[in-house]
């Protein structure tokens, strides 16, 4: 039976980033993703601040970067609206499927193992099933 220091259930962005950081510290990490592919299905709209990505150690590539948003017009149910403009804080639209794959690659390069089409049913005293 294979043994790992850490087993992470779910290959979402948070699971993959956790795997990346834990593996960087020298621990053996296994990520179990029940889906057939990392990044599917898409669970988020993909709007993130450029500074947040930078802080998390993610630099968008040409595949992950879709566009940049400098302003937004938000409508309330009453019909009133507010416009938000930003010269400092940039919000970018990312392709979440590709972003997840980019972070998965970073996790693997840090030493984590990722298994797709693999879930687990329960935690036991001897491990997981």
Model-predicted regions and their roles:
Residues 2, 67-70, 116, 126:
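Short, basic and Ser/Thr-rich N-terminal targeting/leader segments
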Residues 74-129:
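Conserved N-terminal helical subregion
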Residues 9-12, 34, 95, 116:
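A secondary-structure boundary/capping signal
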Residues 39-73:
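N-terminal FAD cofactor-binding segment of flavoenzymes
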Residues 7-9, 20-43:
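Glycine-rich FAD pyrophosphate-binding loop
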Residues 14, 18-19, 23, 107:
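Small-residue (primarily alanine) positions within well-ordered alpha-helices
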Residues 1-14:
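Beta1/beta-strand and adjacent pyrophosphate-binding region of the FAD-binding site
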């Amino acid at each position: 039976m294979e043994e790992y220091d850490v087993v992470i259930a779910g290959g979402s962005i948070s699971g993959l980033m956790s795997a990346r950081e834990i593996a960087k510290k020298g621990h053996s990490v296994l990520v179990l993703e029940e889906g057939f592919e990392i990044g599917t299905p898409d669970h988020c709209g993909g709007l993130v601040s450029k500074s947040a990505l930078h802080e998390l150690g993610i630099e968008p590539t040409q595949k992950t970067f879709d566009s940049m948003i400098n302003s937004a017009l938000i409508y309330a149910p009453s019909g009133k609206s507010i416009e938000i403009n930003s010269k400092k804080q940039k919000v970018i639209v990312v392709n979440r499927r590709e972003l997840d794959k980019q972070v998965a690659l970073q996790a693997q390069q840090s030493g984590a193992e990722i298994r797709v089409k693999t879930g687990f049913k329960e935690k036991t005293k001897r491990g997981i099933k």
